[in-house]
């Protein structure tokens, strides 16, 4: 077995063990949500009250302040919610997870020729959306595996989107957090993963898994996949200490 495959096998085992404790099979799971009927225009800022296991740490990541001893804090979801990443990273390199330099990408590169020399974020997102079968939960596959199998859920869409963006010289990263989805009557929150691409110095959501719901979804980032090496699963598991336990929708921001 190749070293990469062996390491990936151990990573998957660790991930499965970690999920067994909370009975989660895929990264997409329901978060308890309080949401009275509220009219919020698409793209408008939204006020929410977040309850988390370590609210102070999460609030600091999101650039807001949580009161000492409080278990929840208020947060306004804007157009481009984001958290700061490592300042010394370009988010362009091929890594163990975002491994666009592997041979499994060769057939995909041929299919991407129609995208031109520098595709837009929308083009990449649409390409991944139609390429990956979203009804096949996997569990944080490497980008090269997604390129070969073309199966997965939100995490597979995210890593493949980031890989293709970097392949074209566009800074991209993977974010883990909450997708807050509106049905026109209220909101429901789900654990989610998505890619972000850098445009004019701003990180912008590039979510191929929820392309069809793009007008009705808002994002609450909790952390980045900072470690894209062999220890990526343990890095992601560390975010569980700050996981959002409940979302209460307060209404549109003033």
Regions found by a protein language model. Name each.
Residues 7-16:
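Bacterial N-terminal signal peptides
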Residues 21-86:
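Intrinsically disordered, low-complexity N-terminal segments that are enriched in acidic
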Residues 26, 30, 43-51, 57, ...:
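Low-complexity, Gly/Ser/Thr/Pro-rich intrinsically disordered linker/tail segments
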Residues 35-36, 63, 113-114, 149-150, ...:
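Generic recognition of flexible, low-complexity loop/linker segments
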Residues 52, 77-79, 100, 199, ...:
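Non-catalytic surface loops within mature trypsin-like serine protease
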Residues 91-152, 160, 226-228, 238-254:
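Secondary-structure boundary elements
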